[in-house]
């Protein structure tokens, strides 16, 4: 795979080329994902649940993201790599800059932060320093206690308008990519069509520019109740490689997520 850059991803949006992304946490899987053609990987704070066994992302520390970012970058030298800033690691500009430096130096191309209007100054300060920022709105897992659980956001008119406003405000502040999580498909469509930056969806329908899934969900190895937007790509494919190929193809063709996996 040739090196994936933010310019290339922006061109995909411009040319209406859909793309697949996946979470990755270690060398072996990231190497396999890159070999099979996954262009974008996220070292997500979801590792708190999938790797560390917690019941939320809240216990994850910046050291954890740093460690896993290094491992993923070794396995996937050419993929575009996002890394989360975990809970309370960006509560001040000074703390954000310090922690962002650690993650970028570990191999990430871009950092991802959760939240809306309150992040405007943070995004501006990072952008001034030529640091690529991905926003994350809708269901924000770091706010799980405030949101009273993992549930769809933006169903009510006022909440939908708030999410739309946040998307535009964050783009104006300088984010270069946006993740929409667990919002209605038509709301995600409206946001995607009206932003100039690439929009990646998870549980937000098929109208976004790209899709992302947690690797354990995609491979059907997550315990507990299966989320509506999760599809097991491994069960009928016989190998992880074939599962990844099917995922990429279904996203590119606009077949995933179908209505069955959307809100």
Curated annotation (Swiss-Prot):
It is found in: Cytoplasm. It catalyses: 3-methyl-2-oxobutanoate + (6R)-5,10-methylene-5,6,7,8-tetrahydrofolate + H2O = 2-dehydropantoate + (6S)-5,6,7,8-tetrahydrofolate. Pfam families: Pantoate_transf. GO terms for molecular function: 3-methyl-2-oxobutanoate hydroxymethyltransferase activity; magnesium ion binding. SUPFAM superfamilies: Phosphoenolpyruvate/pyruvate domain. Binds 1 Mg(2+) ion per subunit. Its cofactor is Mg(2+). Keywords: Cytoplasm, Magnesium, Metal-binding, Pantothenate biosynthesis, Transferase. Pathway: Cofactor biosynthesis; (R)-pantothenate biosynthesis; (R)-pantoate from 3-methyl-2-oxobutanoate: step 1/2. One of its GO terms (biological process) is pantothenate biosynthetic process. Catalyzes the reversible reaction in which hydroxymethyl group from 5,10-methylenetetrahydrofolate is transferred onto alpha-ketoisovalerate to form ketopantoate. HAMAP family: PanB. This is 3-methyl-2-oxobutanoate hydroxymethyltransferase. The gene is panB.
């Amino acid at each position: 795979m040739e090196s994936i850059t933010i310019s290339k991803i922006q061109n995909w949006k411009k040319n209406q080329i859909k793309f697949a992304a996946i979470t990755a946490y270690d060398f072996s899987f990231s190497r396999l994902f890159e070999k099979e053609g996954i262009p974008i990987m996220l070292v997500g704070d979801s590792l708190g649940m999938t790797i560390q066994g917690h019941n939320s992302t809240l216990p994850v520390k910046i050291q954890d993201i740093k460690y896993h970012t290094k491992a993923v970058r070794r396995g996937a030298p050419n993929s575009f790599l996002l890394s989360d800033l975990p809970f309370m690691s960006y509560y001040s500009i000074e703390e954000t800059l310090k922690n962002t430096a650690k993650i970028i130096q570990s191999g990430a191309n871009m950092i991802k932060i959760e939240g809306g209007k309150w992040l405007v100054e943070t995004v501006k300060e990072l952008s001034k320093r030529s640091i690529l920022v991905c926003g994350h709105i809708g269901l924000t897992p770091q706010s799980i206690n405030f949101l009273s659980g993992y549930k769809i956001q933006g169903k009510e008119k006022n909440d939908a308008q708030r999410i739309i406003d946040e998307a535009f405000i964050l783009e104006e502040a300088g984010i270069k990519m946006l993740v929409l999580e667990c919002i209605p498909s038509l709301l995600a469509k409206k946001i995607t069509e009206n932003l100039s930056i690439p929009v990646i969806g998870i549980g937000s329908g098929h109208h976004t520019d790209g899709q992302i899934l947690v690797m354990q969900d995609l491979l059907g190895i997550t315990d507990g109740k299966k989320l509506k937007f999760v599809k097991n790509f491994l069960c009928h494919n016989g190998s992880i490689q074939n599962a990844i190929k099917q995922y990429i193809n279904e996203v590119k063709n606009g077949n995933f997520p179908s209505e069955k996996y959307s809100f």
